[in-house]
A protein has these predicted regions:
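Glycine-rich phosphate/dinucleotide-binding loop and adjoining beta-alpha-beta core of small-molecule
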Residues: 1-151
Length: 151
């Protein structure tokens, strides 16, 4: 990615499971000056992932794209979901990009139920999170609650 998009900031960490105090400070500083952030890809569901997602979510004006393990953390952390919903009341600047399995975890529903009603499930996720949701399957359904749906 760095070669194809040299202006992208890539930050690596010593351990995938814990952040040192210095790494946490660096991450928080990077979030303050960033134009946008994508979080979740390559992360693991662990304390450092939870902390990074919380730090990014706390930057209210920072547009975020949350994918992969960022979504899995969000599904397990009610307080993070509330934080995102609250910040999106003013400005919708968080995009969630779940595939059907991640969408099922976000909604706490069986995957078969979500797959059988993928459009309705994507709309429900947008309503519950206050975020823009791009539900991915053979087609992609993009919606923000109360706004037109795009397929």
């Amino acid at each position: 990615m760095q070669k194809g998009l040299p202006e992208a900031l890539i930050q690596t960490y010593e351990s995938p499971h814990t952040l040192t105090e210095e790494e946490e400070k660096l991450f928080a500083e990077n979030m303050k000056w960033a134009d946008a952030a994508a979080i979740g890809c390559g992360m693991t569901v662990c304390e450092s992932g939870r902390r990074m997602l919380a730090l990014a979510a706390a930057q209210e004006t920072l547009p975020l794209v949350i994918d992969a393990d960022g979504l899995n953390i969000l599904a397990d952390e009610e307080s993070l979901g509330k934080l995102l919903k609250d910040r999106n009341r003013q400005e919708k600047n968080v995009v969630l990009t779940p595939h059907m399995g991640e969408l099922a975890r976000l909604l706490h529903k069986p995957i078969a139920e979500v797959v059988a009603a993928e459009i309705e499930s994507t709309i429900q996720a947008a309503k519950e999170t206050g975020c823009i949701v791009a539900g991915k399957s053979a087609r992609t359904c993009v919606c923000s609650f109360g706004e037109p749906l795009f397929l």
